[in-house]
Amino acid sequence: MSFLTNFLLGLGLSMDAFAVSMSSSTTIRPFHQKDALKLAVFFGGFQAFMPVLGWLGGSAVSGFVSNYASWIAFGLLTFIGGKMIYEALYGDPDGKINSLNYSVLLMLAIATSIDALAVGISFAFLNTPILEPVIIIGCVTFVMSFCGAVLGHRIGHFFEHEVEIIGGLILIGIGGKILAEHLLWI
């Protein structure tokens, strides 16, 4: 595959991570560059790791991916989005919410990288070398997630709790999109 093809693949796979980074960063106060870096490392790392996992597993995990992964992603994103909405409505009135603990980051990273797992499986079926696409996918996702986190914080700073609610709705919407795509392909 060409560099351009791998870059466009990375860009497509990074869109969910970009949106989730943007949504997540609206709730972090005080926000520091290390928070954006933490999001970028988790999302970029998982987007790079999951195709390798899919490539190594090949057809052994294809049944699981096609049958359950979309439901898992939907459940995780809906849970986290609902939690964000709840915290925006009933949380700390000072707005000091830190949802960047490692368990939440892990759930978000897994939920947004399930498509990358499926890409890795398709690479195995097509006998495609994995190293170059994985590096490009991980780097593109890292940059997109970092930019999404910084942008989300700047928007969130102006709109406070309304953006937290919108961010939660975006996460639920992404989960719904993943599930709808799965159900339409059955």
From Swiss-Prot:
Spans traversing the lipid bilayer: 1-21, 41-61, 71-91, 105-125, 130-150, 165-185
Record Pfam families: Mntp (PF02659)
GO molecular function: manganese ion transmembrane transporter activity
Keyword rRNA processing annotated: no
GO cellular component annotations of the record: plasma membrane
Record's keyword terms, sorted: Cell membrane, Ion transport, Manganese, Membrane, Transmembrane, Transmembrane helix, Transport
Signal peptide annotation: none
InterPro entries, A to Z: Mntp/YtaF, Put_MntP
Compartments, as annotated in UniProt: Cell membrane
Superkingdom of the source species: Archaea
Topology of the protein relative to the lipid bilayer: Multi-pass membrane protein
Function of the protein: Probably functions as a manganese efflux pump.
Family per record: Belongs to the MntP (TC 9.B.29) family.
Matches recorded under HAMAP family: MntP_pump
Name of protein: Putative manganese efflux pump MntP
Gene name for this UniProt entry: mntP
